[in-house]
């Protein structure tokens, strides 16, 4: 997370508590990479005033990237992007009704002038959003750049050391 001495550089927000089952994968990546982050439920539909306040104060609060996850109508990422210049990465949360395709379409089809970087549906999208946010931050942070490089190497080494899909022999 973050502390007074190490303020959050990234915010992870989601439309409801149930979205945490997906968005926790972004937080896990930040914990591994030691990226200070803030986590909060900000509903586009249930708490619109909170959404506006959050987005309008994002830059002032020191956020350099916002990851917004939402399911269903999934207006959260786009509405945040409309109210801030901080880059927004949208994560479509998989829903029971349409398997997250509805969320994907809501996030990816933004009008010209209000960009949202859209990731994959579900857990992979949440993890990749965190990795992409870390890569953005690493353009001006050599230590984070090295941690990302080490993480990628460990990922590669794990595959090379365990090539048998059946597990240990």
UniProtKB/Swiss-Prot annotation:
Catalyzed reactions: 5-carboxyamino-1-(5-phospho-D-ribosyl)imidazole + H(+) = 5-amino-1-(5-phospho-D-ribosyl)imidazole-4-carboxylate
Source domain of life: Bacteria
Pfam families cross-referenced by the UniProt entry: AIRC
Transmembrane segments: none
GO terms for MF: 5-(carboxyamino)imidazole ribonucleotide mutase activity; identical protein binding
Pathway: Purine metabolism; IMP biosynthesis via de novo pathway; 5-amino-1-(5-phospho-D-ribosyl)imidazole-4-carboxylate from 5-amino-1-(5-phospho-D-ribosyl)imidazole (N5-CAIR route): step 2/2
GO CC terms in record: cytosol
Residues holding substrate: 16, 19, 46
InterPro entries in UniProt: PurE_ClassI, PurE_dom, PurE_prokaryotes
HAMAP family cross-referenced by the UniProt entry: PurE_classI
Protein name per Swiss-Prot or TrEMBL: N5-carboxyaminoimidazole ribonucleotide mutase
